[in-house]
Amino acid sequence: MTTPLSPLAKARTAAHAAWRRLRWSWAQGQRALRQSHPDFWRQVLQELTLGRHWVDRTVMLGFAVLTGAVVVGFTLLAEGAIQAFRAIDSWGSAGRYLVLLWTPLLTVGVLWCTRRYAPAAAGSGIPQVLRALDDGLDHARRSALVSLRMSFQKIALVCGGLLAGLSIGREGPTVQVGAGVMSAAQRWLSPRAGLDAHDLMVAGAAAGIAAAFNTPLGGIVFALEQLTRRRGLSHSTWVIAAIVMAGMVSVAVFGNETYFGRLRVQQMSWSLWWPGLCVAVCTGLAGGLFARLIVVSARGLPDRFTQWRATYPYRFAAGCGLAVALIGLVTGGATAGAGYLTTRQLLEGQSDLPGVYTLLKFCATWLSAWSGVPGGVFAPSLAIGAGIGNDIAWLSGMSGEAAIPLIALGMVGFLAATTGGPITAFIIVMEMVSGHAMVLSLMACALLASAFSRLITRSMYDELAALLFPMPHRR
């Protein structure tokens, strides 16, 4: 008669049986692994012994975090500059007329600092990065366009332009800022890292977009569509990891909110088909005209204005600043700055803008760029596009929440037409307005608007990049 096992003995027997099954499964797994990947463990051991390789990866991701932090700081400074200008503008009637003196004087001051200390900071920043990505450019010229020092100079000058009340944005400049910060990582990387200046600048530029718009996906698409057309990436995995890391820094600071908050854009209905088509065509033509004006203004024409700008750059900048201030006075300050508040109010169906807002915002943004002051056109383009969508909605008899889909289409259409990047525009606007219900509508509008824009002009950024060298002399 067998003696029954004690509970402890039963547990020990079960444990031994489980251990035998585990060893058998492990052996089977190892045998299968050796058959399919005979060099697996050797490669793992080799990977773990490459200490410098892991140091390079740590440096890459560390500078990605630094890029995100710098862009976050840039965002906070830019918002502070906008609020400071609005505080000046809100000093009653005296403040409104003080702006007529404040804006031209500060515009001249920012232009003087730009021409004296950082001539490569003028303009958006995206053309500078595109030019720096040219393999035929020597190191000295590339460093003049993209460097850590240039990044901080760009931040200061753009904030100065926003403090002046000019119609400029900070999103385009973050491309140059991010590329400059990330390019500084090259001195800390080993020659075996395989990451050259091209990869670092692409990673930094796209990381800047990801952190600026709080959308890592937008940064990745921007890198693929705008920055790698001439040459691909040798280490795309680490470039994408850097973009995501910078975007995570922005999310950690500002939260997992979309650019304009949690907005719920309605799904397009068949009743909006004709107004939506009209928005796509109008934003495409208007965006192409705007891009053409920016390029022609930078290149110059044989006319009196171009001669005056070349001979008396500071007087010309003062004139542009005065015109922008007058436009702001007419619109009650709605055209000053990037246009975030106005665009958000339109998307919430709460804004009551003057009928000429879209045209005046268009002119204010063009004059701000023509003055030569550093600043981008991303956010102003969104505001102009939102205005076009709102105007067409009004002409179609729509208002309030019913107009929101057309406003979103106007944003994506004008941005795609201006920048020449329909996929980037579609992704950014979709993430900014949480418009996943309008995915196909936004994509179709971006592609159609971009096609109409190409009837008027070539890529604005490529045209501006071709004008960068020789660099202007310091004065």
Spans of features found by a protein language model:
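Alpha-helical transmembrane segments and immediately membrane-proximal extracytoplasmic
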Residues: 1-475
